[in-house]
UniProtKB/Swiss-Prot annotation:
This is Photosystem II reaction center X protein. PSII consists of a core antenna complex that captures photons, and an electron transfer chain that converts photonic excitation into a charge separation. PSII forms dimeric complexes. It comes from the Bacteria. The chain crosses the membrane at residues 26-46. It is found in: Cellular thylakoid membrane. It comes from Prochlorococcus marinus (strain MIT 9301).
């Protein structure tokens, strides 16, 4: 672990660059959740509820 730390220090990585990279990565995760995961979850819940209602109403006929 110490070797990796020394390598990063020797490569002149600054804390500001690392911080900006981490903020960008977290922002990407949030954007992915908003654009992909949440709409897909809402769609699957909607479809499963609709299917449940269709099966219930079909069974009563």
């Amino acid at each position: 672990m110490l070797q990796i730390s020394n390598l990063l220090l020797a490569a002149d990585f600054s804390a500001e660059v690392a911080n900006n990279s981490a903020v960008g990565m977290i922002g990407s995760f949030i954007a992915a959740a908003l654009l992909i995961v949440i709409p897909a979850t809402a769609f699957l819940i909607f479809v499963s509820q609709k299917d449940s209602l269709d099966r219930t109403s079909t069974g009563r006929r």
